[in-house]
Amino acid sequence: MSKEKFNRSKPHINVGTIGHVDHGKTTLTSAITTVLSKRFGGKACAFEQIDNAPEEKARGITINTSHVEYDTELRHYAHVDCPGHADYIKNMITGAAQMDGAILVVAATDGPMPQTREHILLGRQVGVPHIIVFLNKCDMVDDEELLELVEMEVRDLLTQYDFPGDNIPIIRGSALKALEGEKIWEDKIIELANSLDKYIPIPVRAVDEPFLLPIEDVFSISGRGTVVTGRIERGILKVGEEVEIVGIKSTTKTICTGVEMFRKLLDEGRAGENVGILLRGTKREDIERGQVLAKPGTINPHVKFESEVYVLSKEEGGRHTPFFKGYRPQFYFRTTDVTGSIELPENIEMVMPGDNINMVVTLIHPIAMAEGLRFAIREGGRTVGAGVVTKVIA
C-alpha cells in the first residue's frame, strides 16, 4: 500500500485535554472531532474510540493515551486525550510536555476539583505554555450567577499557578449536547476552535537547533526493520541522515531510513511533530523508551547534575513528611524514570514539603541531558517534586 504524502500547508499545533475525572475530557475530544469534521473535513472520532486508548506500557505501569487530529479554519491540530485515572500524572509528565496548549475541562456542575488543581500545577511544571478553559455541562446549570462563580474560581486557580487567569478564554458549553448535534452547543465547539486559533500562538519551533527525539516506543515491523516513535523535540531529521542513540546504554550510531506521521510518509521530520522513525540495522532489543535519537555529537549522557527542585506540599498531593540526604526517589526525564540519590547543601539537614531546594542528584544509569532539562520526582506512584537541571557535573 503506497502511503500518501502528509499535507503541510497549515500550521501544526499540539494540544490536549486536562482536568478532573468525569468532567468530560473524552466527550469534549469526541465533540471537537465530530463538529469540526462537519465544517472543515477530517475524521470524527466516537467517544468509545478515544476512551479505548491504546495501552502503552511504561516500566510495568500501563498508560493509555489517545491521539486524534482535526482541522480548524487556520490550523491542523494533533490532540492527546489522557484518561482520568490515578496514573494520569505520569501521562502529564510524559505526555503533556507535548502540548503547545491545553484545554482545561471543568464541569460547571462541580467547579474546580482536586485533579483540576493538580493538572494546572503539573501543566506549570512540565511547561504547558497556554491553557484555555472549556466550562462543560453548562446545559445542566440554569443559574447564571453560579456559572460566574465557577468561572471566577477557575481564574483564581490559574492565577495561583502563574497562568494569566484574568485573560484566559473560558468557553461555556456542553460537550455531550454538541456531540448529539444541538446547534447552539455545536457553535460553542466552533467558538473553542476559534479560541485555540487566536489564543495559542504558533509555537516558535526549535527547527534550527540540532535534531533530538526522546524515544517513547520501539517496535519492529517485519520486512522493514525497527521503528521508534516520539515527538521531535528540536531540529529536523531527513531520510538518509546519521543519528546517535544516547542514554541508558553506550551511545551507538545508526541511519534513518524512513519518517512517517499519521501513517503518511515524509522526506523529513521536524521539531514539534509526532513521528515514527525507521532505523537501519538496529535491533528491537538494542533500543528502549527513555533513550534519545540525536544528531551525532550534540548531546551526551550524564549521571550527576545540580538541580533546582520544587517539592510539592502535602496540599498539592506531595509528601506529608520531610526527606533527608540519601533519599532515593525516581527521577523522570522526558519519557523515562531513573532511580537516583540526592545530596543536600551543607547547612541543610532535611527538606520539607513546599520547599525550594538546590540539590545534587546521582542517577543509577546515564540519561541524555543538558542544562535546562526538566524532570519530575516521583515515589510510590505519585509526583512529589519537579525540577530543572542547572549544571551537569558528570
Swiss-Prot record:
Amino-acid positions noted as binding GTP in the UniProt annotation, renumbered to this chain: 19-26, 81-85, 136-139
Start and end residues of each stretch annotated as G2: 60-64
EC number: 3.6.5.3
Signal peptide coordinates: none
Region feature (G5): 174-176
MF annotations from Gene Ontology: GTP binding; GTPase activity; guanosine tetraphosphate binding; translation elongation factor activity
This protein's GO CC annotations: cytosol
Residues covered by the tr-type G domain: 10-204
Region (G1): 19-26
Location of region: G4: 136-139
Stretches for region G3: 81-84
Residues annotated for Mg(2+) binding in this entry: T26
Entries under SUPFAM superfamilies matching the protein: EF-Tu/eEF-1alpha/eIF2-gamma C-terminal domain, P-loop containing nucleoside triphosphate hydrolases, Translation proteins
Record's keyword terms, sorted: Cytoplasm, Elongation factor, GTP-binding, Hydrolase, Magnesium, Metal-binding, Nucleotide-binding, Protein biosynthesis
Matches recorded under HAMAP family: EF_Tu_B
Protein name (record): Elongation factor Tu
Organism (species): Buchnera aphidicola subsp. Cinara cedri (strain Cc)
Gene from which the chain derives: tuf
